[in-house]
Structures are given as structure tokens and as C-alpha cells.
Amino acid sequence: IGMAVECKDGYLVGADGCKYGCFTRPGHFCASECSLLKGKDGYCYAWLACYCYNLPDSVPVWDSATNRCGKGK
């Protein structure tokens, strides 16, 4: 019996709805953060934010349609 696991890629977001910044972080920061959230890998993208691959579907990622960064709570 097989089991399907939903995975997604995207920018990590903090509690404030903003992407995780990585400009001043060590090179391995994003990969480590993605791994902690059960993602396969990650890197600091050109927008200077952490991008992750194969995250569990339950992990929130940044979405322009639901962006709340800088808009208060």
C-alpha cells in the first residue's frame, strides 16, 4: 500500500508574515532552517529570503495573494 505525501516549495515566513531574511546570515542558514521544518533543501534566493524545497504541506510559505508582511496583525 502506497502513501502519498504532499510537498511544496516556497519562501519561509515568520509569525509576522514576512519572508525569512538571509542577507546577513551564514551560508548554511536557509538549508538548516528548511531541514528543521522537514524540507529537503534550501538556499538564500536573490530576493534575500530563504527558499525551501519539498516542505511538508503543513508548513506555511509566502504567497503574494495572502501576504500580510508589513500590514500589522
From Swiss-Prot:
Question: SUPFAM superfamilies this protein is in?
Answer: Scorpion toxin-like
Q: Which SMART domains match?
A: Knot1
Name the InterPro entries for this protein. Answer: LCN-type_CS_alpha_beta_dom, Scorpion_toxin-like, Scorpion_toxin-like_sf, Scorpion_toxinL, Scorpion_toxinL/defensin
Question: Which keywords, in A-to-Z order, does the entry hold?
Answer: Amidation, Disulfide bond, Ion channel impairing toxin, Neurotoxin, Secreted, Signal, Toxin, Voltage-gated sodium channel impairing toxin
Q: Which GO terms describe its molecular function?
A: sodium channel inhibitor activity; toxin activity
Query: What GO CC annotations are associated with the protein?
Result: extracellular region
Statement: the UniProt record of this protein carries the keyword Coiled coil: no
Superkingdom of the source species = Eukaryota
The answer to whether UniProt assigns keyword Membrane to this entry is no
> Which residue ranges does the record assign to the LCN-type CS-alpha/beta domain?
8-70
- Protein's GO biological process: defense response
Q: Which residues carry this modification: Lysine amide?
A: 71
Q: According to the UniProt entry, where is the signal peptide? A: 1-7
User: Which Cys residues form disulphide pairs?
Assistant: 18-69, 22-44, 30-50, 34-52
Please tell me in which tissues this protein is expressed.
Answer: Expressed by the venom gland.
Localization per Swiss-Prot or TrEMBL:
Secreted
Also noted in the record is: Negative results: does not affect the cardiac Nav1.5/SCN5A, the peripheral nerve channel Nav1.7/SCN9A, and the voltage-dependent potassium channel Kv1.5/KCNA5.
Q: What is known of its domains?
A: Has the structural arrangement of an alpha-helix connected to antiparallel beta-sheets by disulfide bonds (CS-alpha/beta).
Q: What family is this protein classified in? A: Belongs to the long (4 C-C) scorpion toxin superfamily. Sodium channel inhibitor family. Beta subfamily.
What is the annotated role of this protein in its UniProt record?
A: Beta toxins bind voltage-independently at site-4 of sodium channels (Nav) and shift the voltage of activation toward more negative potentials thereby affecting sodium channel activation and promoting spontaneous and repetitive firing.
What is the official name of this protein in its record? Answer: Toxin Td7
Organism per entry: Tityus discrepans (Venezuelan scorpion)
